[in-house]
């Protein structure tokens, strides 16, 4: 199902539809938010990827309990709000579409660096996470991503991270790899929208769209999602 206010979002000529069905899940997810990821290089802001985050509909009833009375600004400024999205007991789906070309090594090493930094700051970097990072890097090792190609992640509450690839903006029917590590699955999303997330624009989009959805009649009723 889709609610009237769940619309598509266009980021740098990449249009993310209101709903998707990931290749490894029987569920349809709604578009929670999207934005650009870029870096300030000298005096120019260089845009590298367009990032979107989809959530299972159950996320609305879970998140609204604590956050439905908050404004968009309050949600945007709250690290705990984004932490609740990252760790919540519902599926998440992220799509990263290239604006600039990147190699698999360039992309995966930066993500891995961000994940390890998160774990070290929390004192939870163990051999299990180091092994998961090695698996993550190996999935991307020999790949290249031209503009318009996409990397897709599905995060399951049971702790699995499913990785898929697409030559364009479409959702593939097959998966490329599954890594069973809960901390890694959460850290990949955390690196996008967490406290030091790489896409402030995506965070702003999430806060705005979810703030409005929380206030829609019936949206936060779990029965309305069945």
Swiss-Prot record:
- Catalysis: reaction(s): a chalcone = a flavanone
Per its UniProt entry, which superkingdom is the organism in? Eukaryota
Keyword terms of this UniProt record? Flavonoid biosynthesis, Isomerase
| Role | Catalyzes the intramolecular cyclization of bicyclic chalcones into tricyclic (S)-flavanones. Responsible for the isomerization of 4,2',4',6'-tetrahydroxychalcone (also termed chalcone) into naringenin.
Its gene? CHI3
Q: Does the keyword Nucleotide-binding apply?
A: no
The protein in question is named Chalcone--flavanone isomerase 3
> What is the species listed in this Swiss-Prot or TrEMBL entry?
Glycine max (Soybean)
Site-annotated residues for Important for catalytic activity? 107
What is the enzyme's main class?
isomerase
What's a GO biological-process term for it? flavonoid biosynthetic process
Question: Under the GO molecular function aspect, what terms does this record hold?
Answer: chalcone isomerase activity
Q: In which pathway does it act?
A: Secondary metabolite biosynthesis; flavonoid biosynthesis
Other observations noted: Part of the biosynthetic pathway for all classes of flavonoids, a large class of secondary plant metabolites, many of which are brightly colored.
The entry's substrate-binding residues are 49, 114, 191
